[in-house]
């Protein structure tokens, strides 16, 4: 991964939202000590608990993973970043909106609890009244707060 992404040393940060948040958590759980800072936003982190709790529909995980959870629960677990969360050592900021029904907030709470319990540097921002679209169409005050925290987190851990 380091060669492909052009990462030479641990001076870089990583962040992503939605699928990018999924990938950020996947990358930091499979490549510990690669990044100095991470920000996971509005991410799907656990396929198993997302089924039936997301507004995207109960068929989405089956369509994406190409298998029925009741027939192959191990695939759902194998493809979930939460399965590998115990490998994460990167300081991680988690940003989630309380009214996010696409990737319900319990997804973020699972990751935050795991990291906090293990002593990983972490923080979680919860934005009341905001949806999955916070970074694009949230209230101006919340969008500014989010941006300020992103800058602050990376400054704290990258500088």
What are these regions (language model features)?
Residues 1-159:
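Active-site-proximal cap/loop segments of hydrolase catalytic domains
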């Amino acid at each position: 991964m380091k060669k492909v992404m052009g990462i030479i040393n641990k001076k870089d940060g990583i962040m992503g939202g939605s699928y990018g948040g999924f990938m950020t958590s996947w990358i930091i759980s499979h490549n510990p000590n690669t990044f100095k800072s991470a920000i996971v936003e509005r991410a799907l982190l656990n396929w198993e608990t997302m089924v039936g709790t997301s507004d995207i529909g109960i068929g989405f995980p089956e369509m994406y993973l190409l298998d029925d959870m009741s027939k192959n629960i191990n695939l759902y677990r194998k493809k979930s970043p939460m399965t590998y969360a115990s490998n994460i050592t990167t300081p991680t900021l988690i940003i989630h909106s309380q009214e996010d029904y696409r990737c319900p907030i319990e997804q973020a709470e699972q990751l935050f609890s795991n990291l906090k319990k293990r002593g990983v540097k972490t923080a979680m921002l919860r934005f009341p009244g905001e949806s999955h679209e916070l970074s694009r169409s949230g209230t101006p005050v919340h969008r500014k707060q989010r941006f300020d925290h992103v800058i602050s987190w990376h400054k704290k851990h990258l500088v």
